[in-house]
C-alpha cells in the first residue's frame, strides 16, 4: 500500500503516475472515486484513511498518464525546402501537407512568405515567388533567403507547372528532372552561344540534386514501373481534405487537350485528311502568291498545324484516357523567356538531342543556389494555343507527385546531407 495525498492505494498491478486529482477530470466530486467515463471502479467512501480499490474488470494493468507536451519547433528543425512560382502552385503545395505548423519569425531582410508543415517525417518550408516576379533570377533570390532563415535545409524541390513537348508528353502529365546523358536534369537553354538561326550551344553546367533525392527518385521510378503512381490517390485525399479545391485542382473531366482526339462520330475528319487539307491550302496559298492573286500567308502557321495533327496521330497510338496521370523522367529546359511557338520549341528540343520533355522559367536559377529536383505538371504545349485552363490541375498533380517522392525520401539519408547553406558557402 502507498499513501497518495492521504489516500491508501494498492500498488500492484496498478500504477499512478500523477497525483490523483490531476489524473482525470472525469472523476466525480462526491469523493466516491467513481469515474463517469468507465464506471469500472469498486470504491469505498473516501476519507483521510479510506482505501481506493480499482478493479481489473476493464484494464489490466491500469496505467493513467498525462499527455506529453508537443515540442516547439525551431528554424533548425526544417530540412526540406519547397519553392513554387505561382500562388496556385503554393495552394496545391499547402493542400498536400499532412500537417500545417505555426509560423516562425524571420529576419527583417527576409521578404519571403513561408508556409510550414510536414509530410511523412519531413518538416517542410514552402516559399512562393513574389506575385508578378517570375523567372530564374527571382527564384534564386527566394531560395537564397530561405536557406539563410532555415539554415538546416538539406534538400530542395521546385514544384509547379510547365510546358510539355509533344508527342511524348501530354497535358496533365508530370515531368521530373532526371540527369540524362551529359545533362544534369535541368538545362538553362538561354545561357550559351548562338550558332545558326535559333540553334545554340549550351555552355557551362548546373549543379546536380543532392544524392538523397536521387536515391528517392530511383525508388520512385521503380515503384511506378511495378505498381503505378500513387498520384491519383493523393489527389483524391486532397479533395477530401479541401473540397473547395476539387472543381479546379483535382477534376480534369471538363478540360480539353488539343492534341487528344476523342471523337467517336462516324463523320469525324481523320487526322490524315486534315493533314492533306492543310497541305493543299499551303500549295494554293503559294500558287496564289506567285500569280499575284493574294499575299502569302505565314508558312510557319501551317507547319505548326501540321505538327500538331501529326502529334495527334502519334498520341492516339498511346491510347491514354482523359484523367490518366503519367509520370516522365528526363530533361527540363529552363530559361527567362516564355515559349509560345511550336517551331522554336521543337528547335530547342532538337538542339538538346531531342531529350527535352518540358520547358519552364524558374528551375535553372535554382540549381546553382538551391540544388533540387524539379517537378512540373504539364499545363500547355508551349505553342500559340498556350492558355491557363490546365494550370491549377497541373499544379495539383505536380504537388501530389512531390508528396509521393517525399514518402520515399528516408530521414536518415537527409540527415547525411550537408545543409545547402554550407554547400553554397564552399563555392
Regions found by a protein language model. Give the residues of each.
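Aromatic (phenylalanine/tyrosine) cluster motif
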Residues: 5, 14-20, 27, 59
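Residue-identity detector for glycine
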Residues: 6, 30-33, 47, 427
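Intrinsically disordered, low-complexity segments enriched in serine/threonine/proline/glycine
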Residues: 11, 29, 38-41, 52
